[in-house]
Amino acid sequence: MDYLGIIMKIAIISGKGGVGKSSISTSLAKLFSKEFNIVALDCDVDAPNFNLMFDVKDKKLLEVIYREIYEINDDCIRCGKCLDVCQFDAIGDFKINPILCEGCGACELICEFDAIEPIKRESGYIYEGFVGFPLIWGELEVGESGSGKIIEHIKNHAKKYKAELGIIDGPPGVGCPLISTVKDVDLALCIVEPTKSSVNDCLRLIETLNFFNVEYLIVENKKGMNNINYPFKIFHSIPFDFDVPKLIANKILLCDSNSKVSESIKELYEKLKEFI
């Protein structure tokens, strides 16, 4: 599927956090960049770390994302109708809490005195950096919502590169951010670790991908950490290695290390090239 100028898009995702998704995606991005014209997108906007692993120094602010909320002005006569209609308990003492307000506009509609008006509030930011290839990532402001909207804007900014390949570090879970990330990708890599919670969450992830007709492969990370029988087919396994936390702490990509994990990720890369 060719959209936004990117010929093929691969999303690296997981049913739960902490399984090594970003560690794998950063290494795959670097490996693919040696043979393909790529753009990397970090769509885990609640906790982006792609830029941290590549230690981006000169980041550029591409866009500020706003959401619409409401505030009460001096025309308020304190009738209380807005308090009754607000479903999010965002109005107290005739002031609207900007964190709780979802911007539905019910309060403005019911107010007979034009005492409630919309305002814009910063909800997130989109940045760009270059690490041998272009990297675009988003950051959701603390306490804000609208991660799906930010992800859509990240994708729109990627179109200018007309890349052969888009490597997307997606969010964990099966919520709105995940759906915004995978709904139009060509291939999803589902990262799972040998724990019951990871397996159960991966099953939910597979169900979501099937609903949206997204092709996927399952990659086991930390193989050997625990014995477990998977209820799905494993495409590739990456071994458990005690040195991985040290490598990450020192901002060393797994593919650049002299470890068994590095060799396994390179093997995964060679297998993935067959899908391009």
UniProtKB/Swiss-Prot annotation:
The entry marks the following residues as binding [4Fe-4S] cluster 2, namely: C86, C101, C104, C107
Q: Which residues bind ATP?
A: G15, K16, G17, G18, V19, G20, K21, S22
Q: Where is each 4Fe-4S ferredoxin-type domain found?
A: 68-96, 92-121
**TM region positions:** none
List UniProt keywords, sorted A-Z: 4Fe-4S, ATP-binding, Iron, Iron-sulfur, Metal-binding, Nucleotide-binding, Repeat
Q: Which residues bind [4Fe-4S] cluster 1?
A: C76, C79, C82, C111
The Gene Ontology terms for molecular function here are: 4 iron, 4 sulfur cluster binding; ATP binding; metal ion binding; oxidoreductase activity
Q: Does the keyword Membrane apply?
A: no
Give the matching PANTHER family.
Answer: 4FE-4S CLUSTER CONTAINING PARA FAMILY ATPASE PROTEIN (PTHR43534:SF1), MIND SUPERFAMILY P-LOOP ATPASE CONTAINING AN INSERTED FERREDOXIN DOMAIN (PTHR43534)
Protein's name in the database: Uncharacterized protein MJ0578
Q: Which organism is it from?
A: Methanocaldococcus jannaschii (strain ATCC 43067 / DSM 2661 / JAL-1 / JCM 10045 / NBRC 100440) (Methanococcus jannaschii)
Phylogenetic placement of the source organism: Archaea, Methanobacteriati, Methanobacteriota, Methanomada group, Methanococci
